[in-house]
Amino acid sequence: MKLMKLFGCAALACMMTGCISFSRERTEITITEPSGEMIATTCVRAPGKIVVDGKMDEAWKAVPAVTHFHCPPNYEEPISKTEGRIAWDDNYLYVLLVAQDLDLMAYTDFHDGPTYKDDVLEFFFAPGPGPKTLEYINFEINAMGTVYDAYHPDRTKGLNGEEACKWECEGLKSAVTRKGTLNEPLDKDEGWTLEIAVPWKAIPWMKGRQCPADGEEWSFHFARYDYSKYLPEGKEELSSSAPLPKVFFHDVDHFAPLYFKK
């Protein structure tokens, strides 16, 4: 496991520093006048007990859905639809992501591996308005359930994949369910669901605090890589819930506002 962990970290470090070129998130295609609308999301208190099992239970149905996904940089509507929900209680920050997917694909099976090469759902968040925030966290979990977690303490120093990869979200709960057959291109699938619970005590900037205050502002976005033979020319589709002006999911300046509500 240690060897695989080191391999994952080394590979990620190379991707982020440019010594290899297969990380598509390094492609910074920009448009002159971004037209995406910045939509704020309210993180409500969980209306009931949330069991992390990768399913849309009754508690989740009462949480507002985030449906405004688009494909950067031109803000096109994704072919593969995604829906996200976010809630909290005294112990955890919860996320549920439901993805339509006709061709489920994932091969990365070791922790902190290159899950972006697979069908993957991602959650990025930072402790304040994006332009004023240095640190952030991202989770990238593939359709197999493999977890990549990273903490970036100071984004002004660049993307240090090796250091970010060393952080582990202690006590993280995650679950994936699929409607379809993984890695079977001859059939047509329906999609998959990811559910995670991030302990407040595991978040570096929450030391000494139990949970965010009522009305506190953070920033975030949900993101996705979808690889499918059913997409035009069989290419991948990248989408986000934030108006990113370039194909770069780590663009903290353009994370969307997230307000906590009791």
List each model region and its residues.
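Low-complexity intrinsically disordered segments
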Residues: 1, 14, 24-27
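Bacterial N-terminal signal peptides that target proteins for export
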Residues: 1-8
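Bacterial N-terminal signal peptides
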Residues: 8-18
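Structural preference for beta-rich elements and adjacent junctions enriched in aromatics
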Residues: 20-262
